[in-house]
Amino acid sequence: MSSAVGKRYARALFEVASERSKIDQVEADLGAIVEAVEGNEDLKKIMLHPHIAADAKATLADELFKSHVGEEAFNFLNVLIENGREVDLVDIYRSFVQLANEARGFADAIVTSAKPLSTEEQNELAEKFGQTLNKKLRMTAVVDPAILGGVIIKIGDRLYDGSLKTKLETFAQKA
């Protein structure tokens, strides 16, 4: 699947959830569906098998999820099954979570450093970049000695490279 298709489905579901003030519920329900499908190999094989009829998948979804998730998530799952997009469920869920987090003012950041950062350093980076982007950042720290020093911060599709390795490479190219 192209991620553009998944994003369109996620955006459509997000708009419905937003209009009904059910973003949190839909996110939790969709997460429960994803967890159930991904956590059970037999269920996953059935739901993702291209030669199993949509009617059979819809009946199975009805038995497993109708009384356990809200109307929006359940109906959305049926739309995916009808359109042959159930294989894209995980990607759609990830896109939905990203949209929900953006609406809440959250962003995920991956901070790569040569040595482990202290909690204080992580909080300071989260605060400074959070203020710049007007977001509350959730930091994930990664240690990569190859960057030599400094930090590389990835937030969404933005990359802030303050690593010593990149600075040395840039300097060497200019020399």
UniProtKB/Swiss-Prot annotation:
<dbReference type="InterPro" id="IPR000711">
    <property type="entry name" value="ATPase_OSCP/dsu"/>
</dbReference>
<comment type="similarity">
    <text>Belongs to the ATPase delta chain family.</text>
</comment>
<dbReference type="GO" id="GO:0046933">
    <property type="term" value="F:proton-transporting ATP synthase activity, rotational mechanism"/>
</dbReference>
<comment type="function">
    <text>F(1)F(0) ATP synthase produces ATP from ADP in the presence of a proton or sodium gradient. F-type ATPases consist of two structural domains, F(1) containing the extramembraneous catalytic core and F(0) containing the membrane proton channel, linked together by a central stalk and a peripheral stalk. During catalysis, ATP synthesis in the catalytic domain of F(1) is coupled via a rotary mechanism of the central stalk subunits to proton translocation.</text>
</comment>
<keyword id="KW-0813">Transport</keyword>
<keyword id="KW-1003">Cell membrane</keyword>
<protein>
    <recommendedName>
        <fullName>ATP synthase subunit delta</fullName>
    </recommendedName>
</protein>
<keyword id="KW-0375">Hydrogen ion transport</keyword>
<dbReference type="Pfam" id="PF00213">
    <property type="entry name" value="OSCP"/>
</dbReference>
<dbReference type="InterPro" id="IPR026015">
    <property type="entry name" value="ATP_synth_OSCP/delta_N_sf"/>
</dbReference>
<dbReference type="GO" id="GO:0045259">
    <property type="term" value="C:proton-transporting ATP synthase complex"/>
</dbReference>
<keyword id="KW-0066">ATP synthesis</keyword>
<comment type="function">
    <text>This protein is part of the stalk that links CF(0) to CF(1). It either transmits conformational changes from CF(0) to CF(1) or is implicated in proton conduction.</text>
</comment>
<keyword id="KW-0139">CF(1)</keyword>
<comment type="subunit">
    <text>F-type ATPases have 2 components, F(1) - the catalytic core - and F(0) - the membrane proton channel. F(1) has five subunits: alpha(3), beta(3), gamma(1), delta(1), epsilon(1). F(0) has three main subunits: a(1), b(2) and c(10-14). The alpha and beta chains form an alternating ring which encloses part of the gamma chain. F(1) is attached to F(0) by a central stalk formed by the gamma and epsilon chains, while a peripheral stalk is formed by the delta and b chains.</text>
</comment>
<dbReference type="GO" id="GO:0005886">
    <property type="term" value="C:plasma membrane"/>
</dbReference>
<keyword id="KW-0472">Membrane</keyword>
<dbReference type="InterPro" id="IPR020781">
    <property type="entry name" value="ATPase_OSCP/d_CS"/>
</dbReference>
<keyword id="KW-0406">Ion transport</keyword>
